[in-house]
Amino acid sequence: MISRRGFGQFCAAALVFGRRLLDAANRAPLSWAIQPGASPGSVRQYRANAQIILLGIPVFHRSDVGDGSASWRESATEDGELVRRLEFTGRSAPERAAGLNRFGFIQELSRSGEAIYFGLMTSSPEESAAEARKALHSTAKDAWYSAIDGRMSADGIETARAHFLAPAKTAPADRQILIERARQELAEAPITKSAAASVPQPFLHALASFLCDPRKKQAQYAYNGRMYWLTVERAREAKSPGVVRVSGSLRRVEGGKPIEFRLWIEESSPHPLPLRIEYQAKSYLRLTFEARA
C-alpha cells in the first residue's frame, strides 16, 4: 500500500509531467529571440592557415591568412529544459590571402525536440587550383553569397535557401549588415519541407554530442534538407596529456564522397571547443584553424 508521502510525490511528479506536456503543446516555435541565460559560455578565437595541395602533395603553406571563432552557450530553463546555442565563424583576410575574400559562418539553437540553424557563406565555385588562382587579387566590390535557414521539429524538416549579390565586405565591423541582408533574402525565399522519422540534430549539435560523450561513434544529422552520417574516432595524444584527437567524416545517407576533418579538444572540458581544426575545404586546399593563446 502506498504511503501518504509516496502518494504526494507521485502527484507532484504527475503534475510536473503534465505541465511540461501542456507547455510543449502550447509553446511558440523556437526562434532566435529565445537564447541561453546570462551564462557567458565558452568562446575560442582562431588563426587560420592555408596549405595548397597538388596530386596529394603539399606544395605551399601560408600562416595567418584569416581568422575564426567558435562559441558554446547553454542554460537550463525553470523546467530543466536545456537551451543550447553553438556557432562557428571563419574568414580569409584579403591582405594576407592574396586578395581572396571568403567568409562563412553557421549558428544553431536547440531545445528539447526542436532546433534551428542559420548559415551564410561566400559562394566559392572554384574546383581546381587553376580556377582558384584566377580568383586571387580580385578587385570586385561585390560578391555572391549563399544563405540557408533550417528548422527541425516533430513536424519535419523545413529549409529555405537564398543566393544574392552584396558588397564584398566580411570584416567583423561589416558582418552584421551582411547578416541582415541574408535574413531579408531568406524571408522571401520558398520553404521546402521533408519528413523525418525522428527529430534530427543540426551538424554542430551532433558534433558537440560526440565531443561530450566518448562512447558515441556515429549519428545522423540534417543540413540543407538532406540527412548525413557523421562518424568519428577518438585517440589520446601521447605527446600532449589531456588532449584528444577526433578524426571525423561526413557523408550523405544516400551515399557519395565523404568529407574528412580532424580536431583536437581538451579531454576534461565541459564545453570542448577545439584547440585545432583541420579541414579539407577543396581538393587542392587544406585549412587549419589554431586557437589563439
Per-region residue spans from a language model:
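Surface-exposed beta-loop interaction hotspot
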Residues: 160-194
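N-terminal export signals
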Residues: 6-24
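A generic signature of intrinsically disordered, low-complexity regions enriched in glycine/proline
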Residues: 13-17, 153, 178, 217
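Acidic, serine/threonine-rich low-complexity disordered tracts
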Residues: 21-156, 193-293
